[in-house]
Amino acid sequence: MIEIKNVNKVFYQGSKEILALKDINLHIAKGTIFGVIGSSGAGKSTLIRCVNMLEAPSSGSIIVDGVDLTTLSKKQLVETRRNIGMIFQHFNLLSSRTVFDNVALPLELAGKDKSQITTKVTELLKLVGLADKHESYPSNLSGGQKQRVAIARALASDPSVLLCDEATSALDPATTQSILELLKEINRKLNITILLITHEMEVVKSICHEVAIIGGGELVEKGTVGDIFAHPKTELAHEFIRSTLDLSIPEDYQARLQPNRVEGSYPLVRMEFTGATVDAPLMSQISRKYNIDVSILSSDLDYAGGVKFGMMVAELFGNEQDDSAAIEYLREHNVKVEVLGYVL
């Protein structure tokens, strides 16, 4: 279990004070895969580095398995960190050591005997799918294989918590998915708590049980993945959800798009559907109710946390009054509608 209580972090550039984290409060239950998402500079990397005290909070508490890390001596902190594994975007493997020896390093530093090390490393390499790579060197591995070695090394001391700092950002989509599947398997088999940070909502959608959204060093929104996708409360949450869907406006429409309605133009709208609104026949309802035609240019549908969500870009053909009434009807039925402009 991880508790982050009233955490603030201040950095200084000369005399300038930069508040990187502002009063962050999170509770991460044991065995959960918890995602923290934010854009570059949002403070998410600073937050995850505070969890194992690579960065000490300026104020607040970091409690892992009942122990407040901010109260520990350096010696106590070194011992406690063995219970917290961490992997990074860059794999940080030692190029002069084999795969086996890279994974063995934490065990050697902990003073384990040779037979214990051999048993543990063999078990971990099998877990991460590298049972045949004991004697390989990092230079002979793919990016995904290097990250698997890093994961095995992070698990060597049997931690209860695994921190993942943009662990898939340097990988291609197929390799990213395989690493996420491995993390899910590790979570399931070992009941290890995983805290990961990312700037990709696709990662959150694929693996996380709960998610927190951070912007400008502040906690913007948090909840189960299903709740966030079904009922996003902030514009930042909407932006991240939109990023998971492939929705584009044809170039010829973009060229004809006007900022204001003029004679002969019609509104182009983007609609976001979540939860029950996905299955509701709202397009046919507004077509009948307000005597308008709906031309769908693009749409996409996906699932996250057991919840369906979707987006649509469409042109509405009616008079100005009926178009406005139809848009208001959609909003009353919990559809987020944005008028992108008017097509001439």
Curated annotation (Swiss-Prot):
<protein>
    <recommendedName>
        <fullName>Methionine import ATP-binding protein MetN</fullName>
        <ecNumber>7.4.2.11</ecNumber>
    </recommendedName>
</protein>
<dbReference type="InterPro" id="IPR018449">
    <property type="entry name" value="NIL_domain"/>
</dbReference>
<dbReference type="InterPro" id="IPR027417">
    <property type="entry name" value="P-loop_NTPase"/>
</dbReference>
<keyword id="KW-1278">Translocase</keyword>
<dbReference type="GO" id="GO:0005886">
    <property type="term" value="C:plasma membrane"/>
</dbReference>
<dbReference type="GO" id="GO:0005524">
    <property type="term" value="F:ATP binding"/>
</dbReference>
<dbReference type="InterPro" id="IPR045865">
    <property type="entry name" value="ACT-like_dom_sf"/>
</dbReference>
<comment type="function">
    <text>Part of the ABC transporter complex MetNIQ involved in methionine import. Responsible for energy coupling to the transport system.</text>
</comment>
<dbReference type="InterPro" id="IPR012692">
    <property type="entry name" value="ABC_MetN_proteobac"/>
</dbReference>
<dbReference type="InterPro" id="IPR050086">
    <property type="entry name" value="MetN_ABC_transporter-like"/>
</dbReference>
<dbReference type="InterPro" id="IPR041701">
    <property type="entry name" value="MetN_ABC"/>
</dbReference>
<dbReference type="InterPro" id="IPR017871">
    <property type="entry name" value="ABC_transporter-like_CS"/>
</dbReference>
<keyword id="KW-0547">Nucleotide-binding</keyword>
<keyword id="KW-0997">Cell inner membrane</keyword>
<keyword id="KW-0067">ATP-binding</keyword>
<keyword id="KW-0813">Transport</keyword>
<keyword id="KW-0029">Amino-acid transport</keyword>
<feature type="domain" description="ABC transporter">
    <location>
        <begin position="2"/>
        <end position="241"/>
    </location>
</feature>
<comment type="subunit">
    <text>The complex is composed of two ATP-binding proteins (MetN), two transmembrane proteins (MetI) and a solute-binding protein (MetQ).</text>
</comment>
<dbReference type="Pfam" id="PF00005">
    <property type="entry name" value="ABC_tran"/>
</dbReference>
<dbReference type="InterPro" id="IPR003439">
    <property type="entry name" value="ABC_transporter-like_ATP-bd"/>
</dbReference>
<keyword id="KW-0472">Membrane</keyword>
<keyword id="KW-1003">Cell membrane</keyword>
<dbReference type="GO" id="GO:0009276">
    <property type="term" value="C:Gram-negative-bacterium-type cell wall"/>
</dbReference>
<dbReference type="GO" id="GO:0033232">
    <property type="term" value="F:ABC-type D-methionine transporter activity"/>
</dbReference>
<dbReference type="InterPro" id="IPR003593">
    <property type="entry name" value="AAA+_ATPase"/>
</dbReference>
<feature type="binding site">
    <location>
        <begin position="38"/>
        <end position="45"/>
    </location>
    <ligand>
        <name>ATP</name>
    </ligand>
</feature>
<comment type="similarity">
    <text>Belongs to the ABC transporter superfamily. Methionine importer (TC 3.A.1.24) family.</text>
</comment>
<dbReference type="GO" id="GO:0016887">
    <property type="term" value="F:ATP hydrolysis activity"/>
</dbReference>
<dbReference type="Pfam" id="PF09383">
    <property type="entry name" value="NIL"/>
</dbReference>
